Amino acid sequence: MAAVSINVTTVKPLGDRVFVKVSPSEEKTAGGIFLPDAAKEKPQIGEVVAVGPGKRNDDGSRTPVEVGVGDKVLYSKYAGTDIKLGGEEFVLLSEKDILAAVS
């Protein structure tokens, strides 16, 4: 079996899935206290790096995904599958787990 090299550019989401680069969480509180990793909340904001072709309808057509590459999104706290690539954190989400686009 040949080895497969996986990086951000080789990930192509299927269906209505969205591949998101997780924004880093806060390192310290407003009062200046540094937070240990165990005390940090799981991030819920990230930047879309790839989108699938959309959900397939009963008639065979597709409903396109409402967000695009480069959009910042807010997603459900425990949604998706966490993935680490090249030292960076990503999450693979279903479109239904995206709550809003953030400007």
UniProtKB/Swiss-Prot annotation:
Chaperone as UniProt keyword: yes
Localization of this protein: Cytoplasm
Question: Could you tell me which HAMAP family the record lists for this protein?
Answer: CH10 (MF_00580)
Listed InterPro entries: Chaperonin_GroES, Chaperonin_GroES_sf, Chaprnonin_Cpn10_CS, GroES-like_sf
User: What are the protein's UniProt keywords?
Assistant: Chaperone, Cytoplasm
Which family is annotated? Belongs to the GroES chaperonin family.
Among the entry's GO cellular component annotations, what is one?
A: cytoplasm
So what does this one do?
A: Together with the chaperonin GroEL, plays an essential role in assisting protein folding. The GroEL-GroES system forms a nano-cage that allows encapsulation of the non-native substrate proteins and provides a physical environment optimized to promote and accelerate protein folding. GroES binds to the apical surface of the GroEL ring, thereby capping the opening of the GroEL channel.
**UniProt-recorded name of the protein:** Co-chaperonin GroES
* Organism placement in taxonomy: Bacteria, Bacillati, Cyanobacteriota, Cyanophyceae, Oscillatoriophycideae
User: Care to name a GO molecular-function term for this sequence?
Assistant: protein-folding chaperone binding
Q: How does it assemble?
A: Heptamer of 7 subunits arranged in a ring. Interacts with the chaperonin GroEL.
